């Protein structure tokens, strides 16, 4: 129930959820196509002329709504930030069910994937658009806070005995993995960036960071994680298990 509430809450923020592309206002169509092109081609490789051509409008018409690519990137980032802020502040509460935590992480990864151009080369885009540097860093801290909250919950119910310093290190590792997962996979070049399995592989990778801290529950935890991964994806991650797991 918590997961579906989160999905509805997130969807409610988005614009034009039930509106077809043809019904969108020109400004919203520009934003939609810009995001599509940035994700597909990479933001540095797309010009405002490319966007206008894709929309079959004049560059002047595009300029009427956005005075340049900088304004477009800022608008897209603001939308990304607003929605991600809600997601990161609403982690699954009071639930130890693997499915709940799995689908919460799926929502996190799916939202990042929808704006993956921001993550393709983080340092470059922050250098090019200084106005998003501070809020982007804030999001990274929020990822750490969300991860820390989940780890503290596990300790509170006695699943793990990890101390505060260990929780801080684990939360940082989780935030690091989430932030650079798409970039890492893109560098491997083994599959198209839109592959859904990429998201489930990312979730499994994050959960594998938590498993070593669960003591006797480690094997059961990862067995459940692998079972969910096999059910929802195509098991693209090598089926290696943590030490002590089944052969």
What function would you assign to each model-found segment?
Residues 131-157, 165-183, 200-212:
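Amphipathic alpha-helical packing segments from all-alpha helical-bundle domains
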Residues 78-84:
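Short, basic, alpha-helical segments at the C-terminal edge of helix-turn-helix-like DNA-binding modules
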Residues 4-18, 183, 187-247:
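C-terminal peripheral helix-coil segments that are non-catalytic and often amphipathic
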Residues 26-33, 170:
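N-terminal positioning helix adjacent to the helix-turn-helix/winged-helix DNA-binding module
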Residues 88-91, 119-126, 154-158, 185-189:
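Secondary-structure edge/capping motif, primarily at the C-terminal ends of alpha-helices
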Residues 18-27:
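Short, Lys/Arg-enriched anionic-surface-contact patches
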Residues 75, 89-117, 134:
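Hydrophobic alpha-helical connector segments
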Residues 29, 37-71, 75:
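Helix-turn-helix
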